[in-house]
C-alpha cells in the first residue's frame, strides 16, 4: 500500500512503499543517497549497493525520474528530512527523466518557454502556494461577510482557439 512522505512519522520501524520523483542523487562507494519527493514532502533514501541489485541503473537517474521504493522507515537524527529516512530494500524505476532544458538561473524568457518545467522548482511552487493561500483567505473572508461569489465569462478582443466560432458579441458597433 502506498505511503505519503507526510505519513512516515507514524510508520517508524515499518516497511513502507513510496511513489517518488528524484530531487538529488549522491553516489558513493558502498551507498547511494537519494532525496525523493511526492506531493506531501521530501524524504532521504539510503541504498546499500550490497542489498539493492539495480544500483547501477539508479546511478543513471536524473532529476524528475519517477520510481517506486520499498524500505524500512527509521529515525535518523542526522537526516535533513525531519529526522526520518528510508533504508531501501527495493527500488523500481518507472520513468527516466531527460535533461531539463532550463535551470533556476535561466533567463526569464527561456523559463516562460518551459513553464511546465519551471513550476517544478521550489521557489516557483512556493509563489503559487502563497498566492493560493491569499486567494483562499480573501474568499473565506468575503463568504463569511455574506458576499456572493459568481464567475463571469471572459471576453477578449481577438479570436481564441475555438471559442470565437461559438457566437459574436457586438461591442462599440464592432463584431
Predicted regions and their residues:
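Class II aminoacyl-tRNA synthetase-like tRNA-binding/catalytic domains
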Residues: 3-175
